[in-house]
Amino acid sequence: MAKSPENSTLEEILGQYQRSLREHASRSIHQLTCALKEGDVTIGEDAPNLSFSTSVGNEDARTAWPELQQSHAVNQLKDLLRQQADKESEVSPSRRRKMSPLRSLEHEETNMPTMHDLVHTINDQSQYIHHLEAEVKFCKEELSGMKNKIQVVVLENEGLQQQLKSQRQEETLREQTLLDASGNMHNSWITTGEDSGVGETSKRPFSHDNADFGKAASAGEQLELEKLKLTYEEKCEIEESQLKFLRNDLAEYQRTCEDLKEQLKHKEFLLAANTCNRVGGLCLKCAQHEAVLSQTHTNVHMQTIERLVKERDDLMSALVSVRSSLADTQQREASAYEQVKQVLQISEEANFEKTKALIQCDQLRKELERQAERLEKELASQQEKRAIEKDMMKKEITKEREYMGSKMLILSQNIAQLEAQVEKVTKEKISAINQLEEIQSQLASREMDVTKVCGEMRYQLNKTNMEKDEAEKEHREFRAKTNRDLEIKDQEIEKLRIELDESKQHLEQEQQKAALAREECLRLTELLGESEHQLHLTRQEKDSIQQSFSKEAKAQALQAQQREQELTQKIQQMEAQHDKTENEQYLLLTSQNTFLTKLKEECCTLAKKLEQISQKTRSEIAQLSQEKRYTYDKLGKLQRRNEELEEQCVQHGRVHETMKQRLRQLDKHSQATAQQLVQLLSKQNQLLLERQSLSEEVDRLRTQLPSMPQSDC
């Protein structure tokens, strides 16, 4: 009765310790599952709620499972006690009738084998217990190592996911800048049909990448990106409105230029009409004077040409102002791009702070583990104290045994019954040994299973590490290649822009020259018509007045011929220049067309490359997600296996405790039987001595008997 409260307290302490360990393990496993589920790209917003509910259900099941185990163990102990009571109740009723109530109680207490038979079993039992404790420690150490490795793998996966997110953000920003630049170029120089085709081909992968990125990113990062997108769209709208305003200004300037050209043509037509009217109404002397001084009329044309040059300079200054405004808009776009970069840097700093917080959490976990170790040490010290108290109780019990040994002298007649009971106990011992051997074989098979599982996990961890290193190398190489290609393409685009600007200026100059040449041709034709008219008049006058003006007519004819030759030479020169300008314009147009085709082909190739890169990244992400799911399933299996092993360890511990109690009872009964045997032997010796003394007295009396009748006689 003195040992029952101590055993109950020990069982309670062990149960509390096991519960604390299980709670700690369940928390760590829950944290691992949460960390694995955070980097998943394909999971939506409803999935975390489901995972949370399942984790809560698992925690409830885990907390309820030890209670079920304890109730099952209690039921097993009750069944064992009932079986023992049934076995003891199978004793023959005839013997029970012969035995007194005191003898029956003492018989139940002494129903155990001798000390010599139980020494071997006790030694084997202690060795077996030590072996099981060592195996349990080894399993716990391996489990802790596996947990640490899994934490390392989880941290590495988080780092890879952050790198992928940053790369996607950079790629989206670059694509946006390229699309904006290409849109401006197409709006200014390329036709609307080609612009629409290229725009559609360039926008499709961009929208597709945005969709993939939105699916992959987490909720917080999506909100930040949406804010950035809103700000960027607002800035784009402002810049587009400015561009529209500038385009409207350009259209107005072009209209004014066309109006001025029409006014010039009208004025030139009026001037030509005035000159024709004047020539028709002149007399001979005035006509001669104007023919001699025909160069005076060219001054008017030179003035008009100078005025047109001034207007051209004004238009060029207006174009320069428009270009400066375009440069300002480009600077604004660059400032907006820098602001977006700053926002991304801020987000990266936030992620860095997040990692710091995770490191602090890990440090707190380590401190909690240290505290748990300290509490375990305190438990060990308390257990040692209780062991000392148990030894004291054992000493007191031995004293009580000695006191009760004096009462066991009455059992000298039950030696035969004790021998029969010893035989029964030996049979039970043999059955217990067989059970222990079966348990040992089961434990050996389970050890083999555990070693196999550990080997598989190590192989899988090595494989995952190798694959991770290869993925990191490929990722770095791909990133360097893409950066180089983008820099080269940016340089080429800048060169092409400069060449386009130069060709545009050259085209404008050539167009202006061609317009001037055409105007000069028209003027020369008008002058030729006038000269022919004058020649016709002079010929008519020549017939009437040949004698008076023959000399003057010859001089005028010579002057006219010289003038005609000069005009023909000028016309030929202008036609040659015009042909040259047309050829140059044709070459420029062909070069521009080839350049535009090359640009289109490069854009198509870049779009294809971007699609290939996106497909590769998606396939890599899918592979990583599959590997993560496989590791997650493997973790679940290992957790189940661990729980089963813990349950088996608990059951084995309870069985060992029952066996220890049984062995203690056997020790008590063996010591009591040994004392009884010693007492019986001493009593037998006393009886033998008394028998010898009685036999001696009988012999002495027999010797005395024959002498008694002689004396009577």
From Swiss-Prot:
* Keyword Coiled coil among UniProt keywords: yes
Residue ranges for the region (Sufficient for homodimerization) are 216-713
Task: Print the keywords alphabetically.
Answer: Bardet-Biedl syndrome, Cell junction, Cell projection, Ciliopathy, Cilium biogenesis/degradation, Coiled coil, Cytoplasm, Cytoskeleton, Leber congenital amaurosis, Nephronophthisis, Obesity, Phosphoprotein, Senior-Loken syndrome
Spell out the subcellular localization from the entry. Cytoplasm, Cytoskeleton, Microtubule organizing center, Centrosome, Centriole; Cytoplasm, Cytoskeleton, Microtubule organizing center, Centrosome; Cytoplasm, Cytoskeleton, Cilium basal body; Cell junction
- Keyword Chloroplast present in the record's keywords: the answer is no
Q: What InterPro entries does this protein map onto? A: SDCCAG8 (IPR031887)
Q: In which tissues is it expressed?
A: Expressed in thymus, prostate, testis, ovary, small intestine, colon, mucosa, colon and renal cancer tumors.
Name the coiled-coil region(s): 129-175, 223-273, 348-707
Location (main, coarse): cytoplasm
- Annotated region Disordered: the residues are 84-103, 194-215
User: Positions of the region Mediates interaction with OFD1?
Assistant: 533-713
List modified residues, type Phosphoserine: 4, 28
Q: Name one GO biological process term.
A: regulation of cilium assembly
Q: Where is the composition biased (Basic and acidic residues)?
A: 201-212
- One GO cellular component term noted in the UniProt record for this chain: nucleoplasm
How would you summarize the oligomeric state and partners of this protein? Answer: Homodimer. Interacts with OFD1; the interaction is direct. Interacts with FAM161A. Interacts with RABEP2, ERC1 and CEP131.
Function per UniProt? Plays a role in the establishment of cell polarity and epithelial lumen formation. Also plays an essential role in ciliogenesis and subsequent Hedgehog signaling pathway that requires the presence of intact primary cilia for pathway activation. Mechanistically, interacts with and mediates RABEP2 centrosomal localization which is critical for ciliogenesis.
Q: Which disease is it linked to?
A: Senior-Loken syndrome 7: A renal-retinal disorder characterized by progressive wasting of the filtering unit of the kidney (nephronophthisis), with or without medullary cystic renal disease, and progressive eye disease. Typically this disorder becomes apparent during the first year of life.
Designated name of the protein: Serologically defined colon cancer antigen 8
- The organism is Homo sapiens (Human)
